[in-house]
Amino acid sequence: AIARRRSYYHLKDRPLVDDERVVELIDEILATMPTPYNVQSARVVLLLGDHHREMWHLVIEALREILPKERFIASRDKIDRSFASGHGTVLFYEDTAALNHLRERQPLYADNVEIWSEQSSGMLQFAMWTALEEFGYGASLQHYNSLIEYSIAERWKINPDWRLIAQMPFGEPI
């Protein structure tokens, strides 16, 4: 699966496994992924169906506000055919409250907590991507964080202590 894992930019909305199995997969990976001092600061939100498409619509609307018209049109078209057209999106977060608690518990290593958090999140993203590949899904990793973090948090009532790290749209590769 590791050798087959790559970025797929043309996806379609076809479930290759039951969505409940994807939820179970997320739970399994979160439970087994190494974290600094077992702080378990990673948080994951799975968006499917209309929620998935709505999230990518929020990205498009955020880009509309900042891009010149010709760049916006190209970006919108890319998002529509590459990300929004897929089956779902995995949102990766880090819980800043949990990380701050770790800093307080381990003051000698407080300066390393952010680095460890990034390393742990990277392992989580890689494990998720590889596992989705095992199911036959294609995926890519996106970083529209600062453009959409507030609107996503507001729309889906995301804990304000959670910091958005990445978005992983997935679907059947075309």
Regions found by a protein language model. Give the residues of each.
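Short, flexible, mixed-charge acidic loops at enzyme active sites
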Residues: 58-61, 102-107
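Small-aliphatic-rich amphipathic alpha-helix that forms the alpha element of a beta-alpha
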Residues: 28-30, 90, 96, 106-154
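Short coil-to-beta-strand
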Residues: 84-93, 99-100
